[in-house]
């Protein structure tokens, strides 16, 4: 395999990367995430293997020495150590199908950075960024079709989400591309045709960003533009830019002031986008999810300050510091919804410093005097970093934003001139006869274990869920067992769906032998999951619910009590525990448990309903009448569980 062939493979893979955001397949579980992630990993592994051979053959394609490379290696090293010392190593390395992150993804990002920064020259970067901008133009068109109602918005509501299935993910994609487009607009300012092309593209990107209604990204854009304008207000290189910057500053100030004056008008209140900004208040901030999970993250950091808990282990912090008042929010958080706090929890102080160093060194490299970025280009890249950094105060990163961020880092890195090990030359024959076979074997092994097996597990899982929807329960049981055996990656989700759907399969009309086989598999898988994650409340709760549903009350009680000890403020645990006591005909114990759940947060209506049900079963008429007065007649009449309780006690 010669150098030209290797270069062709690398370039083909790199130019395929901007198309990854469009990949969505219903054949995969979490199609908006896993389709993109598996394609990304395969591409990176192929180009990295080809690059290693190319770098061995030609010293010109070896990494460039710079602070950026060393900072990235430090960051990867720290997160690697945090993975080794994490609460749950498997979670930290593999992540899950819903996120597809973990240390495995960080390794792929590092490999991508090394490859693209080593092989691309300025002309290649121009083509690659323009390919990415062309892709963003297609995404704009897709989003406009969503606005027009031609294409369905997958997450529901009015916020466009493109092919991401999440408006926030689309927002940061557009945010980054707006600044990249501005960079090329400036570079093409003397080309009237391209000037119009880039201007129209920016308008489309801004409109798309606006209709994602993502506050952090929109405010990040305004803040980033403000920084660009401030940095150019005294630009000595270009008088026109100075005037434009002054005008931009005035426009941003007028825009902010005008919105403030109009925030209580019907026009703003009736706008699905503007109303999200006018509704920002101290009350909203105090009652929202971040007001709970951010302090949790700080407490988690205090407990493990050096290397953190490991990626994907926020769940342990969440369960430990959970507050009963969080019943209003989604039941489980796996992120702090703040990138910096997420890294603080995942990799400790060293990890977050490593992450922040990537921003700092990028700024250092572009603003130092011995590079060939113009003042305007420096300010645009600075504005991009500022906008992205602000956006990340309110969200967590995802694959595509990581790819774009690491691409920017690599772009800055590629301008460095000092090449590592430039004077070391290896015989071509040795590379072909020794290095090539060794790399091929390693590539095939990791390709099989990192991609093929997880892919098979993912496909089996989605086939199982489709079979359940079609009530083909025998096939569903077989697919779940196959998914579990295919790979360790994604296994928590496979076990979760196995446990949640077990009762449907076991009470269906499939042959008894098949039921017994599935039951044996399901019980073994659930208990193995508990063994692999011994201190995770969510897993203990899952096991307790499964064992209760299958009639193993004593075993269920053990796991539910463990879940309660791990997460004493979680009402859902008490609901399951109380239901178990009712099934065990220990109704007074059930009432006591339901009372505890109710007392945790008396304003929680679901807890009040469950408490009423407990009172009905326990025959406590005084308590029953008291709780009935606290609930509306419509609530009582429409709740099948209340009617069922009255039926069971013969009333």
Feature names for model-found ranges:
Residues 1, 60-65, 236, 371-375, ...:
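Membrane-interfacial, low-structure loops and terminal tails that flank and connect transmembrane helices
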Residues 23-34, 86-93, 152-163, 288-294, ...:
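Juxtamembrane membrane-water interface segments that cap and precede transmembrane helices
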Residues 24-38, 55-62:
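Short, hydrophobic transmembrane alpha-helix segments
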Residues 116, 166, 282-284, 289-333, ...:
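TM-adjacent membrane-interface loops and short helices in multi-pass inner/ER membrane proteins
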Residues 260-272, 432-474, 489, 493-497:
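Hydrophobic alpha-helical transmembrane segments in integral membrane proteins
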Residues 460-651:
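C-terminal luminal/periplasmic domains and tails of membrane-associated envelope-modifying transferases
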